[in-house]
A protein has these predicted regions:
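Active-site-proximal specificity loops/subdomain of glycosyltransferases
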Residues: 38-80, 115
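Conserved donor-nucleotide/metal-binding helix-loop-beta segment in metal-dependent transferases, i.e.
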Residues: 94-117
Length: 245
């Protein structure tokens, strides 16, 4: 039986439109996954939104995508056999639907076809599918990338270091709904140059450190790093708000 957990990291951030994106993402993805269920490609699915407490700009903690995704996996890993780590601002085209029900014998980079990054062979972010075994082998994501960027590079290094070669999808389409427009790469980079506080400022140093300490910094080390503040299920999605350290 094929059961799918879609795990979405989420944080309200000044100057961004994440709440509006979530309002568009949830009905789209529920319909998208329900179609797969109707065709008997999956037996059940659920979307888990792991919301980081606070609003950056009002507190000092930056967004920590990797830690949120590790938390989402840890709360769902006994319930499903496919885990899709999914950014809230990306909507897949119909041509990608088969990869949402395909058992990932090796990780599947569903967003590998995203036009913004399709010239970057090392890009491993956006939408990635894992099975339980592979995600545990690599100890999940690193927990110490605060701000935008780097945790997906470290995730790819963890796969390669464990002789796990991801399958990159190169045909298909992904719609970027960030801020209501489809940013091109240079536009996205300019936003980050203008708002350096959004970025992980020590990204490259942390990527190199992670090559050595990935066994001690990841999925197996999260249990004292978060506290659940609220848990609300509405139909096929659950919002879990967490305070993280």
């Amino acid at each position: 039986m094929t059961s799918v957990a879609v795990i979405v990291p989420f944080r309200v951030q000044v100057g961004q439109t994440r709440e509006e994106e979530l309002d568009e993402f949830l009905p789209y993805m529920k319909s998208y996954l329900q179609n797969e269920k109707n065709f008997n490609n999956i037996t059940r699915f659920h979307i888990y939104v792991i919301k980081q407490y606070g609003t950056y700009g009002d507190d000092l903690k930056k967004f920590n995508r990797g830690l949120l995704l590790n938390i989402g996996f840890s709360l769902t890993n006994d319930l499903y056999n496919i885990f899709i780590f999914h950014d809230v601002d990306l909507l897949p085209s119909d041509s990608l639907s088969e990869y949402y029900s395909m058992y990932p014998k090796k990780p599947i980079h569903i967003a590998g076809c995203w036009q913004r990054y399709n010239g970057n062979r090392n890009y491993f972010g956006g939408i990635v599918s894992f099975d339980r075994k592979c995600f545990n082998i690599i100890n999940g994501f690193p927990n110490d990338f605060w701000g935008w960027g780097g945790e997906d590079d470290a995730l790819l290094n963890r796969c390669i270091g464990n002789k796990i070669k991801p399958y990159k999808i190169e045909d298909g389409g992904v719609l970027d709904i960030e801020n209501g427009i489809g940013y091109e790469l240079e536009e996205k980079l300019q936003v980050l140059r203008d708002n350096k506080e959004f970025k992980c400022l020590d990204k490259w140093e942390r990527i190199e450190e992670d090559r050595l300490n990935w066994r001690e910094n990841g999925l197996r080390q999260i249990h004292d790093r978060f506290k659940i503040l609220s848990f609300e299920t509405i139909n096929d999605h659950t919002m879990i708000e967490v305070e993280i350290e």
